[in-house]
């Protein structure tokens, strides 16, 4: 057995002092004579009683079940489910918003220093998004009212996926757990999602029920797209399948009231409660199966408004979940790339084409923008969103393959917004090898993979000219960064 396994056992309690913050919403404790312990629900500087929840050969995890010496940054969580054994969706509800941002800034700096060997000249600060700005400068200043809820840091999440228990109750899972918690409400969910009342229905037969809302145009704030997406549970409830296929937007139901899809059309039978599907006041209700969305009613996309225009986004596709994030990140990318008329640009992991759509009018008809995206639905959206710009070419391809294609046009400017796993190694090799790019805007939602990639890019001749961090996910440990690299 390892030293950690000899020192700790699940359920054991130990009094510790949290001395630092770690990636993932944890605090670090170093009890005298014992291995390092990663503790949730604590804050740096606090002395807490921690209960061990997990032991591995390399480390142990614990929950702070009693605070014996509280930090001045500690606040009462706005959600009653934000406690040990409760919902696992949020990490920092027990910290003030300015303290949350300071913790995230510390994690970014740690990762850059430890992984990339990078110390930035300027101190890293995590910026509040519009609606959550501090009223005055300072690390512990209270924030102004949120544009969505009147409460800072709440009501921002425009997409939420709830898990469904076998009895049909929808909720959220506990931290690192398969248990579905009966939460009753989710304060970080957008008001338009909360108004759907998904937690009031029985979703027996579903594995998940997901809700997403579009962002309305400021001139017409009363209209907001909404969609509910259902997936089947691992094993459907018993019930006779309704005969025949389900054409168009109509829904067929079996004799027990569950929505059914014909196997010949969907390759699977989907059963969902008729009352919930018929009653929920979403504009669109869809079933997700085999990477496909099938409408029971409504349409398969949401309309988002950002950068002064509308965007078509597949109902199950990627879009920033904070209402102010798309605008904020677009502005940051433009500032990082400094596009000029006639420039050439490459948008990697482009999604629905947000950054390409912002760059296209700036480089103009004498320039060119190449878009690479692997997801078929996102490519359809990007082509619809960018069709007004003949100088934009949208390609469906795996980014790691596209950058090895000798026919890929050279570009002076590159922007990449990869998933949490970061840049594919082929992309790093391209940027440090065959690419002739002079400026690179790296949009990242994970400080650890960002630091890994920056270390490789710096070794390959790039230099970091600036980093901006944004609190696009209040109450959680997640943070969005835009890094400017030049060479």
Give a label for each model feature.
Residues 395-481:
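S-adenosylmethionine
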Residues 1-416, 421-427, 436:
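Accessory RNA-recognition modules of RNA-modification enzymes
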Residues 482-487:
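Conserved beta strand-loop-helix elements of the APE1-like EEP
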């Amino acid at each position: 057995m390892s030293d950690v396994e000899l020192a700790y056992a699940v359920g054991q309690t130990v009094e510790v002092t949290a001395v630092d913050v770690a990636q993932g919403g944890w605090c670090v404790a170093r009890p005298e004579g014992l291995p390092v312990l990663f503790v949730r629900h604590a804050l740096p500087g606090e002395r807490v009683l921690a209960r061990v929840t997990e032991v591995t050969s390399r480390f142990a995890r614990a929950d702070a079940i009693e605070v014996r010496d509280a930090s001045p940054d500690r606040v009462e969580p706005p959600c009653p489910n934000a406690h040990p054994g409760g919902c696992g969706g949020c990490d920092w509800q027990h910290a003030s918003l300015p303290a949350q941002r300071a913790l995230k800034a510390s994690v970014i700096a740690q990762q850059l220093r430890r992984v990339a060997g990078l110390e930035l000249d300027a101190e890293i600060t995590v910026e509040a998004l519009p609606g959550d700005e501090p009223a005055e400068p300072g690390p512990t200043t209270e924030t102004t009212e949120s544009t969505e809820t009147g409460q800072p840091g709440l009501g921002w999440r425009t997409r939420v996926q709830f898990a469904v228990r076998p009895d049909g109750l929808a909720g959220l899972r506990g931290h690192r757990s398969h248990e579905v918690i009966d939460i009753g409400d989710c304060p970080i969910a957008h008001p338009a999602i909360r108004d759907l009342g998904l937690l009031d229905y029985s979703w027996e037969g579903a594995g998940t029920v997901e809700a997403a809302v579009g962002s309305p145009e400021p001139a017409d704030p009363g209209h907001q797209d909404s969609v509910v997406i259902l997936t089947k549970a691992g094993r459907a409830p018993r019930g006779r399948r309704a005969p025949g296929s389900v054409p168009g937007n109509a829904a067929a139901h079996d004799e027990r009231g569950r929505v059914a899809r014909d196997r010949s059309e969907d390759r699977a039978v989907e059963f969902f409660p008729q009352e919930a599907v018929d009653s929920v006041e979403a504009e669109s209700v869809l079933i997700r199966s085999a990477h496909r969305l099938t409408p029971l009613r409504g349409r398969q996309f949401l309309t988002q408004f950002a950068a002064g225009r509308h965007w078509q986004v597949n109902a199950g596709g990627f879009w920033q979940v904070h209402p102010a994030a798309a605008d904020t990140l677009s502005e940051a990318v433009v500032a990082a790339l400094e596009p000029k008329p006639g420039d050439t640009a490459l948008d990697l992991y482009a999604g629905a084409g947000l950054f390409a759509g912002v760059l296209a009018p700036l480089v103009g008809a004498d320039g060119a923008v190449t878009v690479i995206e692997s997801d078929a639905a996102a490519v359809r959206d990007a082509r619809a969103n960018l069709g007004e710009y003949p100088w934009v070419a949208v390609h469906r391809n795996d980014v790691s393959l596209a950058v090895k294609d000798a026919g890929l046009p050279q570009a002076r400017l590159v922007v990449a917004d990869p998933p949490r796993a970061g840049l594919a190694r082929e992309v790093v090799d391209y940027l440090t090898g065959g690419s002739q790019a002079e400026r690179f805007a790296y949009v990242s939602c994970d400080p650890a993979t960002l630091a890994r990639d920056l270390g490789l890019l710096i070794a390959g001749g790039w230099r970091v000219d600036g980093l901006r961090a944004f609190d696009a996910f209040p109450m959680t440990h997640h943070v969005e960064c835009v890094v400017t690299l030049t060479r």
